[in-house]
């Protein structure tokens, strides 16, 4: 039996994304003497944060009323929306669905917003630990969730303990909040253990790709938000694109493909590359360069696929609970 250190908190939050950090901030605002901890597996807050992202600002205004005075590094007011159906060589402009009007919203970077949220949480007394991944849930004698065990360090390729082995501590709390994002390892175990998905539709998932491009001068319309459906996907495959115009001749470009696609030959990343060769997109990107790129999965089932969010000793928030608003194509404000 490995001897492990034990850390104890009132509330343990697993995941340092927008949901986890907003939860920590709000808890301390409501009850300053709570002992709150946030665990983030990435080496730094924001290092693995990835989203479109268009922010509906109302919830952030309520959480941090002064955030607009010191916004994150990328924070562009939305100016105009476009929605199109792409064919192989052209595009047909469609009415923008009412849920996708972005007046009053902002194009942001989650990778820049989350460090600001973490700094705010720490200023309120929250312990934020990066580089620590939760390896297993812990349970009380009555079966309720008691916290998590941090992964062991110094394990050899063979699975044996190496010379630098350090056992991961146990982090125990009265309440554990799972904010791991889509398909988190602890979340999956607890959904199964407590049958949280017994009375909802099966969750569906999408795989999203995103790139930040630096373009030649004069092509970008800051605040323009463009979405498209259609080519290169067939009409049996769920998916589409986003193109968000930033300042300083930069754009976010991305593509999402539903992972329930039927065609075994479909490769989502290849579909993204095809999309960038569409005449309207190629003309925009030609001569530019990719500054950053990433990919992630999203929970895309919507309201009917949300599991039960609470269980004895724990609850799910953010994408761990499938809170993405699919008609709006937004989830950060829900988180």
Task: List each language-model region with its residue ranges.
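N-terminal Rossmann-like dinucleotide/flavin-binding domain of flavoprotein oxidoreductases
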Residues: 62-63, 72-74, 80, 108-109, ...
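Conserved Rossmann-like nucleotide-cofactor binding loop
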Residues: 19, 44, 183
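Redox-cofactor binding/interface segments in oxidoreductases and associated redox assembly factors
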Residues: 14, 178, 316
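N-terminal Rossmann-like FAD-binding beta1-loop-alpha1 element of flavoenzymes
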Residues: 10-37
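N-terminal FAD cofactor-binding segment of flavoenzymes
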Residues: 41-88
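Predominantly flavin-linked oxidoreductase catalytic cores and closely associated redox partners
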Residues: 120-283
């Amino acid at each position: 039996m490995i001897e492990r250190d034990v850390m104890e908190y009132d509330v343990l939050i697993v995941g340092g994304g927008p949901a986890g950090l907003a939860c920590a901030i709000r808890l301390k605002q409501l009850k300053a003497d709570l002992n709150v901890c946030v665990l983030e597996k990435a080496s730094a807050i924001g290092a693995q944060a990835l989203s479109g992202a268009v922010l509906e600002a109302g919830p952030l205004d309520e959480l941090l009323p002064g955030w607009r005075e010191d916004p994150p590094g990328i924070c562009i007011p939305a100016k105009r929306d476009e929605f199109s159906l792409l064919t192989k060589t052209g595009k047909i402009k469609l009415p923008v669905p009412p849920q996708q009007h972005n007046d009053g919203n902002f194009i942001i970077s989650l990778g820049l917003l989350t460090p600001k949220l973490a700094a705010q949480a720490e200023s309120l007394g929250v312990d934020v630990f990066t580089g620590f991944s939760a390896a297993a849930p812990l349970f009380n004698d009555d079966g309720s969730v008691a916290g998590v065990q941090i992964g062991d360090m110094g394990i050899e390729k063979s699975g044996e303990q190496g010379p630098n082995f350090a056992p991961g501590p146990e982090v125990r709390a009265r309440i554990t909040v799972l904010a791991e994002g889509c398909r988190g390892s602890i979340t999956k175990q607890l959904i199964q253990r407590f049958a949280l998905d017994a009375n909802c539709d099966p969750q569906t998932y999408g795989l999203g790709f995103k790139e930040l491009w630096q373009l030649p001068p004069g092509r970008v319309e800051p605040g323009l938000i463009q979405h498209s459906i259609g080519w290169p996907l067939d009409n049996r495959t769920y998916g589409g694109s986003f193109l968000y115009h930033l300042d300083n001749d930069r754009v976010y470009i991305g593509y999402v493909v539903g992972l329930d696609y039927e065609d075994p030959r479909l490769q989502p990343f290849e579909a993204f590359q095809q999309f960038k060769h569409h005449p309207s997109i190629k003309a925009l990107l030609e001569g530019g360069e990719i500054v950053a790129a990433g990919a992630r999965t999203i929970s895309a089932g919507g309201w009917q696929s949300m599991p039960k969010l609470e269980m004895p000793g724990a609850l799910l928030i953010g994408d761990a609970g499938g809170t993405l608003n699919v008609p709006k194509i937004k989830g950060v404000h829900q988180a």
